[in-house]
Amino acid sequence: MKFQRIQDLRVDSDLSQRQLGEILHISQRSYSHYETGSRGIPIEMLIRLADYYDTTIDYLVGLTDNKAPVK
């Protein structure tokens, strides 16, 4: 399963995979595997990505089109 939304969010933020990997404390290669879907994304990483982008895990994995978290 390709995670298009995490790629779109990264590109919209003008970040390279390497830069986001550094922010998340993982390698560029690991992050690339998450984006392409060649490796599943651990729940801990989904939480970190949702926090970083101020969105929800549901949005990241395509369960909703509502990007904003419920306040």
Which stretches of residues belong to each language-model region?
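Conserved hydrophobic/aromatic packing and binding residues within compact polymer-binding modules
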Residues: 6, 20-21, 31-34, 60
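DNA major-groove recognition helix of helix-turn-helix/homeodomain DNA-binding modules
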Residues: 25, 44-59
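Short basic helix-loop element that most often maps to the first helix and adjoining turn
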Residues: 4-23
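DNA major-groove recognition helix of helix-turn-helix
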Residues: 35, 53, 61-64
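Recognition helix of helix-turn-helix/homeodomain-like DNA-binding domains
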Residues: 25-40
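Residues that mark the N-terminal boundary/hinge immediately upstream of a DNA-recognition element
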Residues: 5, 16, 42-45, 56
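Short, charged recognition helix plus adjacent turn
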Residues: 12, 61-71
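Helix-turn-helix/winged-helix DNA-binding modules
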Residues: 1, 12, 38-41, 52
